[in-house]
Design a protein with these regions (language model features):
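Small/polar, glycine/serine/threonine/aspartate-rich low-complexity segments that form flexible
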Residues: 23-28, 73-102, 229-239, 272, ...
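Bacterial Sec-dependent N-terminal signal peptides
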Residues: 1-31, 440
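Periplasmic alpha-helical coiled-coil/stalk elements that build and connect Gram-negative outer-membrane
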Residues: 134-249, 361, 365, 407
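Short segments within alpha-helical structural elements
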Residues: 50, 193-218, 376-434
Length: 440
């Protein structure tokens, strides 16, 4: 019994670990959970945060350049005199010093650099927001594709079940001679085709799950199971804000637009820094030092005191002719400033194109959804009536299969319109700086 107890404990422990692993593997992910996880773990987002931290260090360095520098130095040397005429063939020399330096004036270049680095820090923070928005768009697209594919699998399974029931009934009718073998073969072929569509839809779903899993940087052993909601119709048919209001809001909240504005400010500071090259620079230096020699008549302590020296210097540099370096720097800074204006304008136009496309997609998809839902209603009614008439011998096999395929196609059209609408609405939410919609 004593030997069995440790074995039982180990078995219970392993069983608990397996259960925990299974629960983790079977975790379902809502859209918001996917977004929250990606914001913390996606590599591109993390790299953009590292770039922001690196820029903060550059700002600290730019600020430190305003303060004096201080350097302590010492040199120890040994000299050998091989000539026999020298009494002491060896000489030891030591020097010691402390030097300080400070730039007093450089045309305001140092302070301008501090301002530019602060602007760059703001731009880096906005770049992080851009990365977050980019991964959000990618995840929303992949998630909606997963939901669409999951619903497509469900519809294909339902269609295959109906085809199987028709095939089974036709088999009985074949035994009684109510239908021909050709009609039965057509229904059998339709059932096989519907089974094949289940496999295709399942493969498509697995592919979309893999894409979503890769966006979240999940481990190979972790499974991606999106939570399939019962989408509320009011979320699909929700009223859209006016297009011009969406664009005006996007201009205020989208990080790339604000980054473009700061890019202009940074370019202006770059031009100011380049113009500083035409101004004189003044720097101050100061040092103290001493030293000693071993073959001197004085003791080392006396030498250090007697050799003690102080130095103060003021350096003035006046640029007279710099081989056009300063003029070239200013002209290139002007060109860069013009480029920054063009980049800002380009970002605004790109945002307008993307926003208008998403808005048009949302409007069109909502109209398609209403139309497809109406079509599905009558296609279902037609299919049900055709099925009843087939049972009593009024409709033939071709008419039954045609009605079934039309109903299945109508269901797929409803799905496409529904999830295209939800995707477009989510994109409009991003352009307005809104959180993800609650589609559950």
């Amino acid at each position: 019994m004593k030997r069995l107890l440790p074995i039982l404990l180990c078995s219970l422990l392993l069983s608990g670990l397996r259960n925990a692993t299974a629960q983790e593997a079977s975790k379902t992910w809502t859209l918001q959970e996917c977004l929250d996880y990606a914001y913390q773990n996606n590599i591109q987002v993390r790299q953009s945060r590292n770039n922001q931290l690196s820029g903060i260090e550059d700002t600290k360095q730019a600020k430190a350049a305003l303060f004096p520098s201080l350097v302590a130095s010492t040199t120890q040397s040994y000299t050998n005199y091989p000539s026999s005429e020298v009494t002491d063939n060896n000489s030891y020399t030591g020097t010691y010093g402390i030097t300080a330096g400070m730039t007093i004036f450089e045309g305001g270049k140092l302070r301008t650099e501090v301002k530019r680095q602060k602007v760059q820090n703001q731009m880096d923070a906005l770049s992080v927001e851009e990365s977050v928005n980019d991964i959000r768009i990618a995840i929303v697209q992949a998630y909606m594709q997963c939901l669409y594919a999951a619903d497509a699998v469900r519809i294909n399974r339902s269609t295959a079940e109906a085809s199987k029931a028709q095939r089974d009934r036709a088999e009985e009718m074949l035994r009684t001679g109510s239908i021909s073998r050709v009609d039965f073969a057509q229904l059998q072929s339709q059932y096989s085709s519907d089974e094949y569509q289940i496999v295709v839809a399942g493969s498509t779903l697995d592919n979309y799950k893999l894409q979503l899993k890769q966006l979240l940087e999940l481990d190979i052993m972790e499974e991606m199971n999106p939570a399939v909601p019962g989408v509320k119709e009011e979320n699909v048919l929700k009223a859209l804000p006016p297009k011009n209001e969406v664009y005006e809001t996007a201009l205020k909240v989208m990080p790339q637009i604000r980054r473009g504005e700061l890019g202009i400010e940074a370019a202006k500071l770059e031009e100011k820094s380049a113009r500083a090259g035409f101004f004189p620079s003044i720097s101050l230096s100061a040092s103290v030092g001493t030293g000693h020699m071993s073959n001197n008549d004085f003791e080392s302590g006396s030498q250090i005191w007697n050799r003690f020296n102080e130095n103060v210097g003021l350096t003035l540099n006046i640029p007279i002719f710099s081989n056009r370096k300063n003029r070239t720097a200013v002209n290139k800074a002007k060109i860069a400033l013009n480029d920054s204006y063009l980049e800002w304008t380009s970002l605004q136009k790109e945002l307008l194109r993307n926003m208008e496309s998403a808005y048009l997609d949302a409007v069109s998809a909502q109209a398609q959804y209403l139309s497809a839902r109406e079509k599905e209603k009558y296609a279902r009614e037609s299919y049900e009536l055709t099925s009843e008439q087939f049972r009593v011998g009024v409709k033939n096999t071709v008419e039954l299969i045609t009605a079934q395929n039309e109903y299945s196609a109508a269901q797929q059209q409803v799905l496409q319109a529904k999830y295209l609408t939800l995707l477009s609405i989510e994109l409009l939410n991003i352009y307005q700086g809104l959180p993800a919609s609650d589609i559950y």
